[in-house]
């Protein structure tokens, strides 16, 4: 098991604790639509409050690319934090400079201050030394409880541990413990479902999982690459032509292992001119109109995947299989969520899901509590699946080794 300094290893009373969370949560019209990542960090915040720390929360929201965008202000999460913690949460409209320094100086033990979006400053994503020094100058201790950001080499993830005594929060430790245990002892048949729209990073994942999984189920925009490679007419469906050669190599590699790659047999198609919705079989004779897109997997595909789930002992899921935010394109993700949850409840399946959209899709299906483990990580979850060491975790490990 990875060795990291824990909260119980540091004295936080009357100390300024810079607590890195992932508050990059889905919102619509300024309203939070899924608070999972906040809820999972509450035990760490409450521990620090109870032990008399001055808790300074730092995070990012969206990708403003070093510019101030009011629609991406972290002020929007203050009310949710206050409701979950049942205390007043102060907000500072800046992350570095005199304003946050003064706000921190005036804090009392047990109080919570949220700084503005770190990515309003370009130094965050550049892991800039000046930004790191400025951000860390008011802190006594650094705590990382943002597993879902720990794959990024950013200032608040990799830089601050080089400047301050550092520890891992409860959520980060929980993620590492559960994921390490699950993937080192995965019972077979081992099935992986990969969907969503982030194609290039997930192709790397598919390539690494071919030697580990018994079934690789590919859906969403990921599947479109393979369908295009087979020269199927997929209309205006999202895919990246430059990735077709990589997909071809993955299929060839899979033939030399016992891994079966499962692609959709049929799909739900929407014509964006007429809004007409049809279900079509995906084959070489398919002719889709240029203004039509694949929006979800079809009933034959759903049935086949459910049959695979029924014989599986471990299922890992990352990425919705359709545009689940819209009805009726949520059927695929909903049926799979319920099938996985049903078998998990019997005790005969270990089910793990990760990624913001995946969590939202499962939550929408009403069965999120029935999964064995829900990871808050998206990109971090993918990199961990590939066996990579996360930069944020490595930074904490280095601090533990040499402190």
Swiss-Prot record:
Family: Belongs to the phosphoglycerate kinase family.
Disulfide bonds: none
Entry-linked InterPro entries: Phosphoglycerate_kinase, Phosphoglycerate_kinase_N, Phosphoglycerate_kinase_sf
Assembly and oligomerization: Monomer.
Keyword Disulfide bond: no
Lineage, uppermost ranks: Bacteria, Pseudomonadati, Pseudomonadota, Alphaproteobacteria, Rickettsiales
Keyword annotations: ATP-binding, Cytoplasm, Glycolysis, Kinase, Nucleotide-binding, Transferase
Any GO molecular function: phosphoglycerate kinase activity
Protein source organism: Orientia tsutsugamushi (strain Boryong)
GO cellular component: cytosol
Any GO BP: glycolytic process
Enzyme class, first EC level, given as a word: transferase
EC annotation from Swiss-Prot or TrEMBL: 2.7.2.3
Main location: cytoplasm
Protein's UniProt name: Phosphoglycerate kinase
Compartments where found: Cytoplasm
Binding-site residues, ATP: 202, 325, 355-358
Reaction catalyzed: (2R)-3-phosphoglycerate + ATP = (2R)-3-phospho-glyceroyl phosphate + ADP
Keyword Membrane: no
